[in-house]
Amino acid sequence: ASETYLERLWKIFKQATGWDGQGTAPASVTLSTSFGAGENHLGAVGGHTDIIDVTVLMTLHATYVANDFVGLSGVPLTFAGCARKNGGTGLIVSAELIDYALQSVAGELWLFNTPIVPPADSAAWTITDAELLTLVCVIPFSTYYASALNSASPVGNLTYPFKCRATSTSLSGAFVTRGAPAYNSGDVTFRLGVLQD
């Protein structure tokens, strides 16, 4: 019968070390159980869910009109840590818009795998063709659940795959209103649920 892989490996080991495995190994035989990591940590193999909150700061914090960009002029939202490692992948599984101002107006969160340059705050939502090619998804918010002071629009059962840039674990975002809310800076928080590979 032919040798198995392990039998052949043992034979090579004995020839290289001169040790037959009986008794204590001679000092010339060094056994190592260390191995190099494929990443900076061991043990995480994916399937980890994370919740990432980002509050929208605004330059003008005014009354917006339908189809306006809402945020800091020329500055996208950054959802840091969406992936486990640089260039990592995952799924967006849920999103929630928290409205502290109780405006409860329809809007969208646009997510990209590369930082974009949005228009000025309260300007018409516009992006370039090149930026559109980096689009991961658009998450609409239209149904709100309100208290006397605030409201929330949760969206579940999402399955949007993403892949971050080679040097990043983040996704870039932009908030677009489809109504006419009156927001102050910090009145809106997005909560993103991600399943990391």
Language-model features and meaning:
Residues 1-103, 176, 181-197:
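Extended, low-complexity segments enriched in Ser/Thr/Gly and acidic residues that occur primarily
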Residues 122-126, 195-197:
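Extended alpha-helical regions
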Residues 128-163:
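Extended, solvent-exposed segments with strong compositional bias
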